[in-house]
Amino acid sequence: MNNFIYETPTKVYFGKDEELKVGKIIAEFHPKKVLVHFGGNSARKSGLLDKVENCLREENISFVELGGVVANPELPLVREGIELGKKEGVDFVLAVGGGSVLDSSKAIANGLANPEVDVWDFHCGKAVPQKTLPKGAILTLAAAGSEMSSSCVISNPETGEKRGCNGLFNRMNFAIEDPVLTYTVSPYQTACGAVDIAMHTIERYFCPGEDTYLTDSIAEAVIKSVRKAAGDCLKNPEDYTARANMMWASSLAHNGLTQCGREFQLVVHQLEHEVSGMYPEVAHGAGLAALWCSWARYVYKANINRWLQYASNVWGLDIDFEHPEKTIETAINMQEQYYASIGMPIGLKELGVKKDDLAKLALDCSRNKTRSLIGYKPLAYEDILVIYQMAYERG
C-alpha cells in the first residue's frame, strides 16, 4: 500500500427535505451575497429553486441568480458568472443541480477569488488557484460526484477543449443530498449517472498499487451497489432506497476513498474528455461507456491478476486458471452487455463520432504527442488512437 493523504472537508447533509436547511447552513458563513447557480428550467419548474431562495430570504441572505448551465459546462458562462459576481459583490456560491452545475460553480468561485488570473489558465495548467470562495451544493443528480470531489471540469467551445482543474480548493464546504430530488431524472440520465459513478471507482481500481485489499473491497462494494441501484431506479424511478444508494455511491466514488493506497489517474476519463469536448452533445457517462470496454481489451494483459480479481469479485466468475484470459474477456463482455442493457452505447459510432476525427482526438488527448496516459500500461499517441479505433468499430 502506497502512502496517502485522505481528506474530505465537505460536510454532507443526507436525506429527505435536507435542502430546507440551506438558509441556516449558509448563514453560518455570514455571506454578503450569494450567487445561486443552476441549469435550465427544471430547477424552477420543480419548485426547488423557489424553496431554496425562500430559505435564504428567511435568513435575510441576499442573493443573485445565474442559470443556463449545460451538460459539459462551458467557459463563457463561467466568465459571465465571474463578472456578475464582481458586480454584485458575491462572496458565496451555491450550486443547485448536477455535476455540471457544481463544476461551473467551482470554476466561478475560483475565478472570483483570483481576479488577477484568467480562470481558463487554471484548467490549462498555467496557474493554480491560491484561494477560493466558500461554496455549497444542493445535488439533483447522482453521477459526477462533484459534490465531494476535488475535481472541476470545464469545456471551452472556442477551442473544443475539455480540461480539468484539481485540488483541495475545489471541495464543497457542504453538500445537501436529498434522494427525492432525483426522482424525476430520466432513465437515460440515470443510466449515464450509473456509468459515471461506477467508472470513478473502476478507474481507481485499475490504477497501480499493491496490497490494498481494504480499499479494493470498498471499491467492489460501490461498483456492485451502483449496478443494483441503477437497475432498481430504472424499474421504479421513485424507489427511495435505490435513489439513496445511487446518490451516496456518487459521493463515495469520487471523494478519494476508493483510491487510498493506490496511484491515481482516470485514464478513460481523459479519453472521454476529448470526445465530449469535440462533441459537446455527448453525455459524459455515455462517452465513458462507449470507450471503457475497448480500453479494457487493450490493456488487460499488462496486469492479468488484477483483472482476474475484478472478474471474480465484481462479476462472480470462476477463474479458469488454464486460460485466465478467457475469464477476463468474459468479464469485459459482461460489462459491455450490462451497458447495452441499460441503454448505454458500447462504441463511438453510436454517439455520432466521425471516423475522420479519431486521429484529432488522439492528438488532443496526447497533447500533440507530448504526453502519455499513465497506468499499468502507459498509453502514448499510437495506443490512444488504437483504442479510439477499437471503440469506433464496436458501435
Question: Where on the chain are the PLM-derived regions?
Answer:
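Glycine/serine-rich anion-binding loops at beta->alpha junctions
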Residues: 90-106, 140-146, 281
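C-terminal charged capping/lid subdomain of soluble metabolic enzymes
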Residues: 314, 318-395
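ATP/NTP phosphate-donor binding region
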Residues: 1-92, 348
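Short Gly/Thr/Asp-enriched flexible loops that form oxyanion-binding sites at enzyme active sites
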Residues: 51-52, 82, 101-115, 148-149
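Active-site segments that bind and position negatively charged phosphate/pyrophosphate groups
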Residues: 204, 208-334
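A glycine/threonine-rich phosphate-anchoring loop and its flanking beta-alpha core
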Residues: 114-214, 309
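Fold-independent oxyanion-binding glycine-rich loops
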Residues: 16-17, 38-40, 69, 96-98, ...
